[in-house]
From Swiss-Prot:
The gene is kdsA. Pathway: Carbohydrate biosynthesis; 3-deoxy-D-manno-octulosonate biosynthesis; 3-deoxy-D-manno-octulosonate from D-ribulose 5-phosphate: step 2/3; Bacterial outer membrane biogenesis; lipopolysaccharide biosynthesis. HAMAP family: KDO8P_synth (MF_00056). This is 2-dehydro-3-deoxyphosphooctonate aldolase. Its EC number is 2.5.1.55.
Length: 285
């Protein structure tokens, strides 16, 4: 599959979707994008910069939701202009799709909306690539139905069906807890879509701080290494210069100063995994 001019798939080096959770302003976005671009260029990692203009799914009605659609899109457009990076953001309802698609390179769907048929059809008919997140309540094999919905909508609109990514972001495991099942990453290959592992949201503790979500950022390197060892097309990781001051999801964000070292480890592991055939593809008795 071609994505933003580069090849993605289980047989390609992983690409990275990274940036702050919420868009916090133009200068911070440019600073983070610039540092990520420099780190990824040196390691040969294709990079898509991400930022959210609205955190619609919040633990509390009093927490920061972000800068809003108009301001957020202006910042993403400027980040793309100044850095040359492709940009990604989430859409939250059908009314936003056309406006967001006119600015960004890749759309993303929130995990909780993965079964909303009209919404999935709307993003699929935008003509843009779409990173479709698996719901925390969904079995990995059920993502095939979601991807099939998107492909059917694209087909109905006369558009390419080869534009969709299947993204794992953890599954609910009791109250205020998520776990990342590594077998899900392999199972989701059966969707026929490139599989992306959202590492940072997989260590989130939804609602774990009462009025906001907690997280275990120290487990991000652990899960990132595990996901790369399974074999994935892409990784999704949110980062921040000072996670304690982040507008949202600070507890599960990677401190920006550690991103390059983490990526160096992951690139080395990815090369080992992808220079050999995947045994699970021919593991019969």
């Amino acid at each position: 599959m071609k994505l933003c001019g580069f090849d993605v798939g289980i047989d390609q080096p992983f690409f990275l979707i990274a940036g702050t959770c919420s868009i916090e302003g133009l200068q911070m976005s440019l600073d983070v994008a610039g540092l990520l671009k420099e780190a990824c260029a040196g390691l040969g990692i294709p990079l898509i910069y991400k930022g959210s203009f609205d955190k619609a799914n919040r633990s509390s009605g009093t927490t920061n939701r972000g800068l809003g659609l108009e301001a957020g899109l202006k910042i993403l457009d400027e980040v793309r202009r100044q850095t040359g990076l492709p940009v990604l953001t989430d859409v939250h309802d059908e009314s936003q799709v056309a406006e967001v698609a006119s600015v960004v390179d890749v759309l993303q769907t929130p995990a909780f909306l993965c079964r909303q048929t009209d919404f999935i059809r709307a993003v699929a008919m935008s003509g843009k690539p779409v990173n479709i997140k698996k719901g925390q309540f969904l079995a990995p094999w059920d993502m095939k139905n979601v991807i099939d919905k998107a492909r059917a909508a694209a087909r109905d609109a006369g558009l390419s069906e080869d534009r969709f990514l299947a993204c794992e972001r953890g599954v609910s495991f009791g109250y205020n807890n998520l776990v990342a099942d590594m077998t899900s990453l392999a199972e989701m290959r059966n969707t026929g879509a490139p599989v992306v592992f959202d590492v940072t949201h997989s260590v989130q503790k939804p609602g774990g701080l009462g009025g906001s979500s907690g997280g275990a950022r120290e487990m991000v390197p652990v899960l990132a290494r595990a996901g790369v060892a399974v074999g994935v097309a892409g990784l999704f990781m949110e980062t921040h210069p000072d996670p304690a001051k982040a507008f949202s999801d600070g507890p599960n964000a990677v401190p920006l100063k550690h991103m390059k070292t983490l990526l160096e480890q992951l690139v080395a592991l990815d090369r080992v995994v992808k220079t050999r055939p995947l045994l699970e593809n021919d593991f019969s008795c």
